[in-house]
Amino acid sequence: MTTLLYILGFIAYFLAYVLVGRIIYNQLYVVIKKDFRIVYWIIITIIGIIFPLCSMISYFTRVGGIIEILGNIGFSILAFLLYLVLFGLILKIILLIMMKFIKKDIVQRKINQFIIFLVSCFLSLSIVGYGFLSLHVPSVTKIDAGKGDNSLKIVCLSDIHYASFGSTLNLTKMVKRINNLEPDIVLFIGDVIDSDIDKINKNDFITNVNNIKSTYGVFAITGNHELKYNTLEEIKDFYLKTNVRLLLDEEVVIDEKIKIIGRIDYSYPSRKELNEIISATNLPFLVMDHQPQSYRESLKEGASFQISGHTHKGQLFPFQIPVSIFYRLMYKTWYIDGIYKKGDFTSYITRGYGAWGFQMRTNGRSEIVSVNFKY
């Protein structure tokens, strides 16, 4: 089934790619000599097939080297082309508006298709460059949650997507950033591993996460990616080799101060209801839930805080719009990013630390969340 979806996705991609190629061709028509128009389409076709094909081969087989490099270049080119078309359309709309107020011949003489193309290229390169920088220079978002005279510093990371195709994630830098915050507790909010555990560099992952320093330890939950490619037993066995405690619809008490509840991802068929996990111990508690749509359940059961990820805030602009529409239609909420408060309850959806597929973030920097949890 997964293979079929990838094949259908590839066909849909290629059809969309041809459409993009046609739009760019129309913009360049006045400057492309007739003899080179066939060459243009040959180049466009080769790029459109080779790069995504390399992406698929590398993703399924984890082949590295030139295959992975070509695939990663393909994602970057695709992002560039998407923005090229987007900016081209915006500039054409601006041009049409100008033509309503300025003599048409003046506008056409001074602003032609080729100039629109050049400006679109500049803007596209700029936003793709910003996206690379945003991924590799994470922000630290500080929030307050809970109530009381005492507090714990809880550092949260979601959607690391370790070993995602083409990933340039540096775990050593990530751990250093975590330790610099001097956390009491560290939480990994799912999609820590991108796909098949057997295909990742286990030694690199284990060595680095075991260097995390926190007063009360490191806790993790599953995301949809871990569960899609691995069984629960495989995930548990892997985490047992680390200093990270995996919570699978479980509750843990931290020094008789607070409780942490870690939920299995929403996609898991046998996931428990939250009220089945909560014990009678009268302590303030927070909920780790990879997908955010069950935040109302946490509110209902009296949680002080819920931390989630999954949405990436769309990762690439303007994909936060269809993501918001999807959540509105499926879960009756527009809430896909940032903080939500109601009474004493606080929920936060992080943009995530890593990236999937496109190794860039044009919708905001990658993120580490530092929670001042009061109890």
Question: Where does each model-flagged region fall?
Answer:
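Hydrophobic alpha-helical transmembrane segments in integral membrane proteins
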Residues: S124-G148, S164-L169
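Soluble catalytic domains of enzymes that build or remodel membrane lipids, polysaccharides, and related
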Residues: D144-Y375
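Non-catalytic terminal accessory segments
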Residues: M1-L135
